[in-house]
Amino acid sequence: MIPANKIPLSDIIWKYSDPKKSQQLATKYFGETIYRSTRKNKKYMIQPPNSKRWVHFGQIPYEDFTKHKNKTRRHNYLTRSARIRGDWKKDKYSANNLARKILW
């Protein structure tokens, strides 16, 4: 497993996200280390405390706010993702919550 702040510049993730900024935000909001996802279509993964499962989040090949810094795109994504159904608001470690807090 590769921690986000140690992902090599040759990794394709740099085209879509800023792993160093993402790690800073993960530390700020969750106090956790995020890792490069082992799934080819996801950017990062995190292991919630007291859990054996890994939560993968961030879709490749889509840029996130840590990369493009476009406030209009950020607003559109946050509006769209706020309407996702389910208990993601109650689950701090849901993929949607992680994407909203760390990537957007």
Please place each PLM-identified region on the residue numbering.
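Arg/Lys-rich, low-complexity, intrinsically disordered basic segments
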Residues: 1-104
